[in-house]
């Protein structure tokens, strides 16, 4: 049983397959077609020091579908922090109010620090440009559900590969399976070499037009303005790539387009009505996956 979920590196292939199998068992409950109250009497503390819509609401939905309750602290409500309270003290206090904590924080390493100071399980919902393990698990779940497998997949990761914690987590997990990975990005947003060196997988840089007919999955990310050290660097790469329905004309019928959302202008709305779009389904899959994680750490 997991105590905390801080990094995707905390899990091996067997752990991942176990969570994905468990998530599938929760899908009917996630859709509201079946009732399950295994977390009745439990309270989840959502601590979001950065803005979030999908991740926070997904955890809240997952918890309530399982019969539990949620207390929320948003970035705007972090009053004690504004008054000078340390993160360690905040975690110690809040862990006395609930049975598990979900934390999102702008500083890389904050989630692991929180786990070291908490008396209850901690789940990382994103720490700066570091990790986002629950997003990775729902991404893997989406690929398995929509493509029917994880091994033997060819995937292209496109967009902001430098600052995206989603990509940094995902590529570590992809390397646990038999996948071919293409990296597509402006040079200024290339995946850091230390991350490439840290994974054992078939990885190469490419242009989308070179691989569009070959890939099974196109995973697109937005350029994250909030991660850039200065406005000028952001302006240089802003709008440097965009997927349209026309872009996908050469893709296999079975190829799927994924995106962790929110999108800005990197995926044109014309893609939404194509057979390739899976990003809204991907977002829903976050509920059963997070139900599986919550049940694992809280029971």
Curated annotation (Swiss-Prot):
It catalyses: carbamoyl phosphate + L-aspartate = N-carbamoyl-L-aspartate + phosphate + H(+). Keywords: Pyrimidine biosynthesis, Transferase. L-aspartate binds at residues 83, 165, 222. Coiled coil: none annotated. Carbamoyl phosphate binds at residues 54-55, 104, 132, 135, 261-262. Pathway: Pyrimidine metabolism; UMP biosynthesis via de novo pathway; (S)-dihydroorotate from bicarbonate: step 2/3. The keyword ATP-binding does not apply. Gene3D superfamilies: Aspartate/ornithine carbamoyltransferase (3.40.50.1370). It comes from the Archaea. Disulfide bonds: none annotated. HAMAP family: Asp_carb_tr. Heterooligomer of catalytic and regulatory chains. Catalyzes the condensation of carbamoyl phosphate and aspartate to form carbamoyl aspartate and inorganic phosphate, the committed step in the de novo pyrimidine nucleotide biosynthesis pathway. This is Aspartate carbamoyltransferase catalytic subunit.
């Amino acid at each position: 049983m997991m105590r905390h979920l801080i990094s995707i590196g905390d899990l091996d292939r067997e752990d991942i397959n176990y969570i994905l199998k468990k998530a599938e068992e929760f899908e009917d409950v996630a859709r509201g077609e079946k009732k399950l109250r295994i977390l009745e009497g439990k309270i989840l503390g959502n601590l979001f020091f950065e803005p979030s819509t999908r991740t926070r609401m997904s955890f809240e939905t997952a918890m309530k579908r399982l019969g539990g309750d949620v207390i929320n602290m948003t970035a705007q409500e972090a009053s004690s922090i504004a008054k000078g309270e340390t993160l360690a003290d905040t975690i110690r206090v809040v862990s006395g109010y609930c049975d598990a904590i979900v934390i999102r924080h702008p500083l890389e390493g904050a989630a692991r620090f929180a786990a070291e100071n908490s008396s209850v399980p901690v789940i990382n919902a994103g720490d700066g440009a570091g990790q986002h393990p629950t997003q990775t698990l729902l991404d893997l779940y989406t690929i398995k559900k929509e493509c029917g497998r994880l091994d033997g997949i060819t995937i292209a990761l496109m967009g902001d590969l430098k600052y995206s914690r989603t990509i940094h987590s995902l590529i570590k997990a992809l390397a646990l399976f038999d996948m071919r990975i293409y990296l597509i990005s402006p040079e200024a947003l290339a995946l850091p070499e230390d991350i490439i060196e840290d994974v054992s997988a078939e990885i190469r840089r490419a242009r989308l037009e070179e691989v569009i007919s070959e890939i099974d999955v196109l995973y697109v990310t937005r350029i994250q303005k909030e991660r850039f050290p200065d406005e000028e660097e952001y302006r240089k790469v802003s709008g440097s790539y965009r997927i349209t329905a026309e872009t996908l004309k050469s893709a296999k019928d079975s190829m799927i387009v994924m995106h962790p959302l929110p999108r800005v202008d990197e995926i044109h709305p014309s893609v939404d009505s194509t057979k390739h779009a899976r990003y809204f389904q991907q977002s829903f899959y976050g509920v059963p996956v997070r139900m599986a994680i919550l049940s694992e750490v809280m029971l």
